[in-house]
């Protein structure tokens, strides 16, 4: 068996790919990933054996590569940081290949926090971008709003199943349904961070009702005040 890497390649711009991840990708024999992620690293994977996968065919692809890899190097790139919102896939890679080296990347949540100027240590980071149930995460969202935390939320696009679709509009209706005055909750929605097609919505959570956002969206609810060291 060769060497297997799972790496984060940043939110969309090659400027956000770390040097160590660049070196690993350049040294790969085989690269497997989703189209958007592969597009981020397109200039680094010329001449390599590339597999473009989807949720439906990824298992078949991984199993085939396991048979063929031998002493080669496989790199599986992930958008953003491999350690955030990707555990279901990473866990499966470890089950299939055994020893997988994981190298982190810069996440869209870090970029969103920077643009909104909120500290991560005063924020709750919640990802709905999973295939499993998000009911507990919804309760976590409610509690974070009540407790006054900043919230960085990755919504869940699932247009084929409205019951699972939980984008900014659905978040707004959910909070209102559970008794929150969403007109008083400030929010940013950042779309397509760093990839040259960025758009930003700034307003109240109430104003998100009925609005459509891309799959590449991050919500930031800002609830804390600035506290510099001069205040203490």
Residue ranges and their predicted role:
Residues 2-6, 145-232:
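A contiguous loop/helix-start segment that scaffolds small-molecule binding in enzyme catalytic cores
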Residues 56-62, 108-109, 131-134, 194-198:
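A short acidic, often aromatic-flanked loop/helix-cap motif at beta-alpha or helix-coil junctions
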Residues 61-65, 137-141, 171:
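Generic hydrophobic alpha-helical segments
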Residues 13, 80, 84-149, 202, ...:
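Class I SAM-dependent methyltransferase SAM-binding "motif I" and its flanking Rossmann-like core
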Residues 33-36, 54-56, 79-81, 129, ...:
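Structural motif
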Residues 42, 85, 134-136, 162, ...:
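Generic domain-boundary/flexible-linker signal
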Residues 1-103, 111, 206-209, 216-218:
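Class I S-adenosyl-L-methionine
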């Amino acid at each position: 068996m060769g060497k297997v890497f799972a790496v984060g390649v940043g939110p969309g711009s090659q400027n956000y790919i770390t040097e160590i991840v660049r070196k690993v990708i350049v040294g790969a024999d085989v690269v497997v990933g989703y189209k958007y992620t592969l597009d981020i690293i397109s200039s680094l994977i010329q001449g390599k054996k590339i597999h473009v996968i989807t949720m439906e065919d990824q298992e078949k692809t991984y199993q085939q590569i396991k048979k063929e890899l031998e002493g080669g190097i496989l790199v599986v790139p992930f958008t953003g940081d491999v350690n955030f919102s990707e555990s279901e896939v990473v866990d499966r890679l470890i089950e299939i290949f055994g020893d997988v080296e994981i190298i982190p990347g810069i996440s869209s949540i870090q970029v969103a926090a920077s643009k909104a100027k909120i500290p991560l240590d005063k924020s709750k980071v919640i990802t709905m971008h999973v295939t499993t149930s998000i009911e507990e995460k919804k309760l976590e969202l409610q509690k974070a709003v009540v407790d006054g935390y900043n919230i960085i939320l990755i919504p869940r696009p699932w247009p084929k199943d409205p019951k699972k679709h939980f984008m900014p509009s659905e978040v707004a209706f959910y909070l209102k349904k559970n008794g929150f005055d969403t007109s008083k909750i400030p929010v940013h929605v950042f779309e397509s961070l760093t990839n040259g097609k960025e758009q930003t919505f700034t307003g109240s959570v109430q104003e998100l009702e009925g609005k459509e956002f891309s799959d590449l969206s991050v919500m930031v609810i800002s609830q804390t005040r600035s506290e510099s060291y001069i205040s203490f």
